[in-house]
Swiss-Prot record:
Example GO biological process: taxis
InterPro entries: ASFV_MGF360
Pfam families listed in its UniProt record: ASFV_360
ANK repeats: 60-92
Biological function: Plays a role in virus cell tropism, and may be required for efficient virus replication in macrophages.
Keyword list, A-Z: ANK repeat
Name by which UniProt lists this protein: Protein MGF 360-3L
Organism: African swine fever virus (isolate Pig/Kenya/KEN-50/1950) (ASFV)
Entry similarity comment: Belongs to the asfivirus MGF 360 family.
């Protein structure tokens, strides 16, 4: 959407330019100033993002509008609307009658449909940066508009985003606010958004175990290392390994738990039980040798593929993995694009049999 006035267009063009510190007075005069710093506008594909030192990674134009409304910043409400922000979304954070009247003058409706609230929620959360995730948490926590949406639909959105979690701690018994807090915290860990992780860690100490579970589930060995070295962990290492093994291809966090002393045979047995074939092969690479027990378990579950795999007597540990390294950078380098040696041996055996 193009700005509606020449002045708004001029401001938009100016906001895309590099301006030296000496000319900041021009930006202030044009109203391109927010949180004691200049506003920068840039495009990322089809979306418009607003940058300030507080939001150096950028936030969407509609999100910036909602924040400006929350702060009752009338000049920026008008400016962002002229730049194309949807003034109806202002209703999500309006907290003063004077601001509500301004939004009406700019064309805002009297209320938002539940579908519109969900659309804004869905669009806003797509921008995976620390500043945006923290802002989403602040905007949506205790927001009365979210109480009116279809809770089943909202929970489905959250479950889908966190579908790789190995345990479901976002349960129906959680309060609505607690559910959302866990959601944003989980997103921060999933995408290793360090500033957001630190924010939630400081604000919600009672969710330390949730952070640990997310790190294990999302294969975030960097955060797992920090948790194990800076926090008191009230979880057995074998339970940590079990959580890591429940999602296939979680080689980084499986290896880290192995390096800390987790029982690799128990990990292989659990991988077989949950039909995590890649993890099973990786456990073999790490020295697991409970082949007969795992074969019997696979037969009981009717896992014919695993029965076929374990019927072969060709598997052995990969020596390069047995050093038990705990440096996350070295682990990441070691296992980046790693293909289990024993899986390769099985593949070769299958090809030979086929030929």
């Amino acid at each position: 959407m193009q700005p509606s006035t020449l002045q708004a267009l001029t401001k938009r063009v100016l906001a895309t330019q590099h301006v030296s510190n000496d000319d900041y007075c021009i930006l202030k005069r044009f109203g391109l100033w927010w949180h004691d710093a200049p506003i920068t506008l840039y495009t990322d594909g089809e979306q418009i993002l607003i940058k300030t030192p507080c939001y150096k990674e950028g936030i969407k134009l509609n999100t910036a509008l909602v924040l400006a409304v929350k702060e009752n910043n009338y000049d920026l409400i008008v400016l962002f609307t002229e730049w194309g922000a949807n003034i109806n979304y202002a209703l999500l954070s309006v907290n003063k009658e004077h601001t509500r009247n301004l939004c009406r003058k700019l064309g805002a409706k009297e209320g938002l449909e539940a579908s519109e609230v969900l659309r804004f929620f869905f669009e806003t959360k797509r921008h995976k940066t620390s500043s945006n995730i923290i802002l989403c948490h602040e905007l949506f926590s205790n927001n009365p508009f979210l109480q009116n949406v279809n809770m089943v639909e909202l929970r489905m959105i959250i479950y889908w985003e966190l579908k790789d979690l190995t345990t479901n701690l976002i349960v129906n018994e959680d309060s609505f606010t607690e559910m959302l807090t866990k959601y944003w915290y989980g997103i921060a860990v999933k995408y290793n958004l360090k500033e957001a992780i630190q924010y939630f860690c400081q604000e919600y100490e009672h969710l330390n175990e949730w952070r640990l579970i997310c790190a294990l589930s999302f294969n975030n060995v960097f955060d797992l290392h920090e948790i194990c070295n800076t926090m008191n962990i009230d979880m057995n290492i074998n339970k940590m390994m079990r959580l890591a093994c429940m999602r296939d291809n979680n080689f980084l966090t499986i290896y880290y738990c192995f390096a800390l002393g987790a029982d690799i045979n128990r990990a292989m047995y659990g991988s077989v039980s949950n039909f995590r074939i890649e993890n099973m092969f990786f456990c073999m690479d790490l020295g697991a040798d409970v082949f007969e027990e795992s074969l019997e378990l696979a037969e009981r579950h009717g896992y014919s593929v695993i029965v076929d795999i374990l019927s072969l007597k060709i598997y052995k540990a990969n020596p390069i993995l047995l050093s038990k390294e705990t440096d996350p950078e070295k682990i990441n380098t070691l296992l980046k694009n790693y293909y289990p040696k024993n899986m390769l041996a099985y593949d070769i055996c299958n090809v030979d049999n086929y030929l």
